[in-house]
Every structure is written in C-alpha cells, then in structure tokens.
C-alpha cells in the first residue's frame, strides 16, 4: 500500500466488541474484514455515496480479492481506529486500502486492501457509474 499524503484518508473509530474477540481475548482475524467494511462504508458516506445509492442504481461492488496483514492485536474494550483510502480506481475495478491503528500509540496493527469490481445486478462486469467517477475526481490525488 502506498498512501499518498495528498489523498483523502477517512478515519473511523469505535470500541472492540466482545463478540469480535477469540478464546485468546484478542480480536479474531476475521473481524478485521468487518472493520475494513466499516471503514469502506464510512469513506463512501464521507464522499457523498453509499452502498444503498450504488445498489439503487442497479450496480454492485463485490469484493474480488483481499489481503490482511496482522502485526499486532487489539482486545475487548480497546478502541479501533481504521484509516481508509482509495488505493486504485479504474474503469471497472476499485481498490480500497486500510490501516488499523492503535488509537493510543498510533502503531499500525493491521494493514490490507480489498479489490472490488463493478457489476450490474446480474453480476456482469460494467464500467463504474459516472457519478462515482465524478465523486472521486473531486478528491485530492
């Protein structure tokens, strides 16, 4: 991941919930995928869109690839801070990148990305909707 200092990075923060932890008392690795989705949804809202808007237009944005790199962990009751940005935007594909930050120390605990492809409601690959492209064009590069 190569975050550019001039691009929009959306930060989302919330507490770790008990159900997200495992028998060792730390956040289960699968929970980070949910955290990535929380960050992605907040990013969309912050730029003026969301999944409901995308789906109302007859489009879908399924995940086609993902990566999660864990170098630290969080426990129940600690706060999660997620940084989300668009890593790559192509006519038919979109990549979001993420960092899960320890809110007290600033340490990057988890990093990763999700790649998505634009489809119609039948699963056929399509170009990104024009409104989406125009929203991203307004963002800092």
Give the location of each predicted region:
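Small beta-barrel nucleic-acid-binding modules, principally OB-folds
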Residues: 58-76
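HotDog/MaoC-like acyl-thioester-processing domains
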Residues: 2-12, 45, 70, 74-76, ...
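Residue-level recognition of specific faces of alpha-helices
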Residues: 32-35, 62, 97
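Short glycine- and Lys/Arg-enriched binding-loop motifs that mark or flank ligand-binding interfaces
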Residues: 21, 35, 54, 73, ...
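Short beta-strand/loop turn elements enriched in aromatics
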Residues: 38-54
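Catalytic strand-loop segment that frames the active site of acyl-thioester-processing enzymes
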Residues: 1-43
């Amino acid at each position: 991941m190569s975050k550019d200092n001039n691009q929009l990075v959306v930060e989302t923060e919330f507490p770790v919930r008990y159900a997200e932890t495992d028998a060792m008392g730390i956040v289960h690795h699968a929970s980070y995928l949910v955290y990535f989705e929380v960050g992605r949804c907040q990013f969309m809202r912050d730029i003026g869109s969301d999944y409901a808007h995308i789906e109302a237009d007859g489009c879908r944005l399924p995940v086609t690839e993902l990566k999660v790199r864990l170098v630290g962990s969080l426990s129940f009751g600690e706060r999660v801070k997620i940084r989300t940005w668009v890593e790559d935007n192509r006519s038919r594909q979109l990549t979001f990148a993420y960092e899960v930050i320890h809110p007290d120390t600033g340490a990057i605990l988890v990093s990763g990305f999700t790649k998505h492809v634009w489809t119609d409601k039948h699963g056929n690959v399509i170009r990104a909707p024009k409104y989406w492209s125009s929203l991203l064009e307004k963002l800092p590069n």
